């Protein structure tokens, strides 16, 4: 089923011309000639340190891991990727460690926003967000282009202790509430583990559906990199295991049938689905409204393509491009093209969402405030992201990966490049080329102190 949703990939410019080295060694010189996908998301690890020591951290971050990447070096890596991506990056993720502890975090964000970077995602544990009013105001100031990926694993004390090593229930609740009130779009990022919190998946999905400006949830099964290397490779939560749990845990509100594979990457790398709240207050999925077969036809993913004489070639192309735009790593509810995408899909596929169509039209002529409010309460994006480790690594997935981590060629003053996320986390020689790991070898400025 997942493999039915593969779409053609986009070409990229190799970091080193003529790099035909074998995988994964090729990535020590950046993206090679065999890579089949460009960069949808560029992830920059701006510090190796964190104010938590999470037992399941794939990056092995902790308060003892000093290493702060100078702002100029972060920007140099981003600029190198911009040059490879024809001057534009759709999604930049700032990560770590805990990126909000970087003493120049605000400067980095503002300098990034001066570039043609459409959206900035901040991967955070939420501690500073829950406690620092000035920082929250900074995020609110930039809420049109800055979004938070908030670690949110569930609601039980045992869940928090297993994944984060501390009781963070109040902090997580405060962070969600404050971000919602500030109008900052947030994705709840859930690390899900068998026997720990795999029975809380439905509750986290419901929180996303019920909370304004929580744009959705990203469910990530625990994988064996970093401090998770002790995970049992034969007894673990899987991609399809998460899909199977959605229906029973939401009483059928969201099921595996509401998601598809992400067409732009390898079909085993991500499932995605949109939930839309109708004018009657009912949640329906984009897939459920359009239908699986019709959606595949609109995407030109089936042999018998649309042959409806009522649909012109131009309209078919418009709908296809809009749907591919939605079903992409580059898309989220803060993307400036979201109004156009949903208007094209809703009008052309006859979804019966009159208010959504009208406000999408208003947004296209400059009235974005009401459309943002509608998106905040009536459109949610659910993704399942099963990252690979050494037990599950597939070369074909690496070659089609579109989530790339900024790296350098073995030294802080070396050439800037990038490599696929899963390879960077799993293979020690490549992990050592992350900007934050290279910065650990140097004298670094002190981090901000924000404790749980």
Predicted feature descriptions by range:
Residues 1-32, 279-452:
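Radical SAM enzyme core and accessory elements
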Residues 2-131:
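Conserved alpha-helical substructure of the radical SAM core
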Residues 27-28, 41, 133-134, 201-204, ...:
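Short alpha-helical segments and helix-capping/turn motifs at coil-helix boundaries
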Residues 46, 58-59, 150-155, 220-222, ...:
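Short loop/turn segments at strand-loop or loop-helix junctions that form parts
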Residues 51, 155, 193-195, 224, ...:
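Short, solvent-exposed loop/turn segments at secondary-structure junctions
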Residues 64-67, 158-162, 228-229:
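A generic structural signal for short coil/turn motifs at secondary-structure boundaries
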Residues 75-94, 102-221:
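Radical SAM/AdoMet-radical enzyme domain recognition
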Residues 163-170, 180-374:
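Radical SAM enzyme [4Fe-4S]-AdoMet core and its adjacent flexible, acidic
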């Amino acid at each position: 089923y997942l493999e039915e949703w593969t779409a053609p990939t986009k070409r990229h410019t190799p970091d080193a011309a003529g790099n035909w080295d074998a995988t994964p060694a090729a990535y020590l010189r950046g993206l090679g000639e065999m890579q089949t996908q460009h960069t949808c998301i560029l992830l920059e690890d701006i510090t190796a340190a964190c104010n938590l020591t999470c037992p399941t951290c794939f990056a092995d971050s902790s308060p003892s891991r000093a290493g702060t990447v100078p702002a100029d070096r972060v920007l140099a890596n981003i600029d190198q990727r911009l040059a490879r991506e024809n001057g534009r990056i759709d999604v930049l993720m700032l990560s770590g460690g805990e990126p909000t502890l970087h003493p120049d975090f605000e400067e980095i964000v503002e300098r990034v926003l001066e570039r043609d970077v459409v959206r900035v995602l901040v991967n955070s544990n939420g501690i500073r967000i829950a406690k620092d009013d000035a920082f929250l105001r900074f995020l609110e100031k930039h809420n049109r282009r800055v979004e938070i990926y908030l670690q949110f694993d569930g609601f039980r004390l045992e869940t928090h202790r297993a994944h984060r090593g501390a009781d963070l229930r109040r902090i997580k609740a405060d962070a969600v509430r404050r971000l919602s009130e500030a109008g900052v779009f947030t994705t709840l990022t859930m690390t899900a583990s068998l026997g720990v919190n795999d029975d809380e998946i439905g509750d986290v999905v419901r929180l996303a559906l019920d909370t304004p400006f929580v744009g959705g949830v990203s469910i990530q099964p625990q994988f064996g990199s970093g401090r998770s290397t002790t995970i049992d490779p034969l007894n673990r939560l899987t991609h399809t295991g998460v899909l199977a749990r959605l229906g029973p845990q939401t009483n059928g509100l969201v099921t595996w049938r509401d998601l598809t594979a992400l067409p732009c990457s390898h079909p085993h790398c991500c499932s995605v689905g949109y939930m839309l709240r109708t004018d009657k207050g009912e949640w329906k999925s984009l897939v459920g409204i359009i239908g699986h077969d019709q959606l595949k036809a609109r995407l030109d993913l089936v042999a018998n393509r649309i042959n409806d004489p009522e649909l012109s070639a131009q309209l078919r192309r418009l709908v296809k491009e809009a749907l591919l735009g939605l079903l992409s790593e580059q898309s989220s509810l803060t993307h400036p093209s979201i109004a156009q995408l949903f208007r094209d899909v809703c009008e052309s596929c006859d979804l019966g969402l009159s208010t959504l169509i009208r406000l999408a039209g208003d947004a296209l002529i400059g009235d974005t405030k009401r459309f943002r409010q509608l998106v905040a309460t009536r459109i949610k994006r659910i993704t399942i992201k099963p990252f690979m480790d050494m037990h599950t690594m597939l070369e074909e997935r690496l070659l089609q990966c579109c989530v790339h981590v900024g790296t350098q060629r073995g030294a802080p003053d070396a050439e800037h490049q990038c490599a696929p996320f899963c390879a960077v986390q799993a293979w020690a020689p490549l992990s050592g080329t992350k900007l934050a790991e290279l910065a650990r070898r140097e004298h670094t400025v002190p981090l901000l102190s924000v404790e749980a």
